[in-house]
Every structure is written in structure tokens, then in C-alpha cells.
Amino acid sequence: MKRYDCTFVGDINPDIVMMAQQLPVLGRELMCDDFYITLGGSTGICAGVFGNLGAKAAFYGRLGDDFLGKFTVETIAGCGVDTSHIRVDHGCTTSVTVSCTLPTDRALMSYDGSHKRLAPEDVPLSLIDETRHIHVGSFFLQKDLMPMYLELFRQAHQRGVTTSLDAGWDPTENW
């Protein structure tokens, strides 16, 4: 029997959500209606929901050694996700997204600190043997891992492990 139902690889960070009726104007301060800080990163959110459903999940990712990194690890662990494979990087700050959320849409601004430091050595191919499914998220934010993903998926399929890929947004829009 496999240790995990799904192993997640990708972006994880806190989201700071600011709710307002309009976007701020440069040079002025806009008071928002409400705000909250929550688990973010498309892969992190997916893993958190999966864990909250009672499934066995693990996460491979990187966070900074700071308050936001600690918050993120504690939050996803509270969802029942195994965080032992999340690397704490003492040389960078945790990635973060600020969402200016209006009643009908949102505008996002992100800092890509720890995400871009996720490296192939952080994601050993041995994870294949411990899981039934591998989900990779935010493909375009993981530049250093792109070449490895093909081999990860190939070996997973050879061993009967299913896979999924959420490409996410390409900040360069080169798709």
C-alpha cells in the first residue's frame, strides 16, 4: 500500500487578500473593507483542500525561514498534509501574493522568493514509490524543474502512478 494518495510538487505561499470596492490609486491610500491571510499558491491550495477532505497528502516545495514560511507550514499541516518534504531555505524570503479583491474580480501582485529556488534535488524520483498520484502545479514558475518533470512523469507512468499538471499562469506570457 502506498503511503500517500497524492503528492504535490510546486508553489506554496501565503495569500494576503485585501477586499475593497475599487483598486487603489497611485499616491493615495485606500482603506479596504476587510482582509485575511490564508494558504496560497495554486499547488498549496490544492494540497490543503485535498488534505481537508481526509486524503493522505504530501507536499514538496520551498519556503523561506521567516514568519510567512512558518505560517504557511503550520497552515498546510493543519489541513493534514505531510510537510516533512518542504525545504526551509535560510537564504531567501517566502514567496507571497497580495490579492486586491473587488466584488467582481481581483488583481494579484506576487513576489517569487522561495518558489524560484525549488530545485531538482528537492524532488527525488523516489517519491514515485510512495504515492498513488503526483500533482505538479504552477509549471511556469518552476523554471529549474521543467526538464525534470518529463522524467518524473515518464517514470511515474511506468510504475502505474497517475499524474496531473496545472500549468498555471506564465508571467512572461510566452506559454
Functional labels for PLM-detected ranges:
Residues 62, 95-100, 109:
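Catalytic-core segment of enzymes that process non-peptidic bonds
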Residues 14-17, 21, 91-99, 122-126:
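Short, compositionally biased "basic patch" segments
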Residues 1-12, 74-88, 102-175:
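Ribokinase/PfkB-type carbohydrate-kinase core domain
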